A protein has these predicted regions:
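OB-fold (S1/OB) nucleic-acid-binding surfaces
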Residues: 92-111
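OB-fold/S1-family single-stranded nucleic acid-binding modules
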Residues: 139-157
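Conserved hydrophobic positions within beta-strands
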Residues: 77-79
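Short, conserved beta-turn/loop elements at beta-strand boundaries and strand-helix junctions
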Residues: 82-88, 107, 143
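Residues immediately within or flanking Cys/His clusters that coordinate Zn2+
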Residues: 40-43, 50, 57
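Short Cys/His-rich metal-coordination motifs, predominantly Zn2+-binding knuckles/fingers
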Residues: 47-50, 63-64, 107
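A broadly conserved sequence feature marking short terminus-proximal activation segments
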Residues: 1-41, 150
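Short nucleic-acid-contacting surface segments enriched for D/E, G, S/T with interspersed K/R
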Residues: 119-137
Length: 157
C-alpha cells in the first residue's frame, strides 16, 4: 500500500504558464475590428429605440430587437469614468497607465481604452485631466491590425 502525503494548507506551487487562445470574434466584433483597421470607430444602432451602441452590440438592451444599422462614431467624446492603473500586467503596457470609459459623440454607451499623452508622475494632477466630463479625442495608431489597441484617447483641453 502506498502512503500519500497531503501538502500543507499553506503550500504554494510556483509555475509559469503560457497559453495561446484563439477564438472566433463573430460578425459584430469582426466588423468593428475591421473598422479599427480602416481608421474608423463603428457602432451599431437600433432604429426602434434610437440607441447607438459602442462597443457595438447585436441586440438592443432597451427594445430587445436586433441592431439594424451601422454608424461611424464621432472621434471626440466625454469621459464617463477613469482610473490610473499602477500595477502592470505581463504582456501589457508598462504601468502606470491611464484608462477611461468614453462616450464618443453620437453614441449612447461608453468604450474603454488607454488615455495617452498624460504626465503620470503626479497622479492627482493626472486624475484631474481625466475626470468625468472632460473631453478626449480618438488617436489612431500609425500601423493598425484590427485590434482594440489600434486607438487610444488623448485629452482635448
Amino acid at each position: 500500500m502506498t502512503e500519500t502525503k497531503n501538502a500543507d494548507a499553506g503550500s504554494v506551487i510556483t509555475d509559469h504558464v503560457t497559453l495561446r487562445y484563439d477564438y472566433a470574434i463573430g460578425e459584430v466584433a469582426g466588423r468593428f475590428m475591421q473598422g479599427l483597421k480602416d481608421g474608423k470607430i463603428l457602432a451599431t444602432r437600433c432604429s426602434k429605440s434610437g440607441l447607438t451602441y459602442l462597443p457595438p452590440r447585436s441586440y438592443c438592451e432597451r427594445s430587445f430587437e436586433k441592431c439594424d444599422s451601422w454608424v461611424e462614431a464621432g472621434l471626440e467624446g466625454v469621459i464617463e469614468t477613469s482610473t490610473i492603473v499602477v500595477r502592470g500586467f505581463e504582456g501589457m503596457r508598462k504601468a502606470p497607465v491611464a484608462i477611461a470609459f468614453v462616450r464618443l459623440d453620437g453614441t449612447d454607451s461608453a468604450i474603454a481604452n488607454y488615455v495617452d499623452g498624460l504626465d503620470l508622475t503626479n497622479y492627482e494632477t493626472a486624475m484631474k485631466r481625466i475626470a468625468p466630463g472632460r473631453r478626449v479625442r480618438v488617436e489612431f495608431a500609425k500601423a493598425r491590425e484590427g485590434r482594440i489597441t489600434d486607438f487610444s484617447f488623448v485629452c482635448v483641453d
